[in-house]
Amino acid sequence: MQFLNTFSKSRISWLLLLLCIVFFEGSALFFQHGMKLGPCVMCIYERVAMMGIAFAALLGAIAPQYAIIRWAGLIAWGYSAVRGLQLSIEHVGYQFNPSPFATCDLFVQFPNWAPLNKWVPWMFEAYGNCAEVVWTFLGQSMPQWLVIIFAGNLVALALIVIAQFFSKKTNTILDM
């Protein structure tokens, strides 16, 4: 735990998290533009959750040695990973438990103050079907892989949060 405590206070740990998210976002863009797999509304929302983790990584990388910055990054990471897990579980439900009464929206709905689909349509515009399985790897669909990825983020986060309470002892004159 001491290692994770020390590691979380280094900029490299937060940049490593950012690098992982850049890889996942790059993969998503490759699927969209390279393989011509149209993202659905849930895919876009899951992408935004990934971006939230990227934001958390950037926040934590600012000054990880300061507890307030580190905890802000950890909280943002946790919120984004939980929301991403919720969205991807819901998406798996649309794919494997189809119902005419449970469908995703036809269009992404962002707040008026941040219409990401208008600002960056090549990344945030949805035109796929949430219930359609368009790609699998090792027998898992894309949202199933996202469940694994977001759950993995939460496991890593839990370990790092627990490690925050295991700081290195400092020697005092009374310890000698």
Curated annotation (Swiss-Prot):
Entry's transmembrane regions: 14-30, 49-64, 72-89, 145-163
Claim: Cell inner membrane is one of the keywords in the record: yes
Its membrane topology: Multi-pass membrane protein
Cellular compartments annotated: Cell inner membrane
Intrachain S-S bonds: C40-C43, C104-C130
Residue intervals annotated with topology Periplasmic: 31-48, 90-144
Annotated coiled-coil segments of the chain: none
Keywords, ordered alphabetically: Cell inner membrane, Cell membrane, Chaperone, Disulfide bond, Electron transport, Membrane, Oxidoreductase, Redox-active center, Transmembrane, Transmembrane helix, Transport
One function term, GO molecular function aspect: electron transfer activity
GO CC, any one term: plasma membrane
NCBIfam families in alphabetical order: PRK01749.1
Role noted for this protein: Required for disulfide bond formation in some periplasmic proteins. Acts by oxidizing the DsbA protein.
Family: Belongs to the DsbB family.
UniProt-recorded name of the protein: Disulfide bond formation protein B
UniProt gene name: dsbB
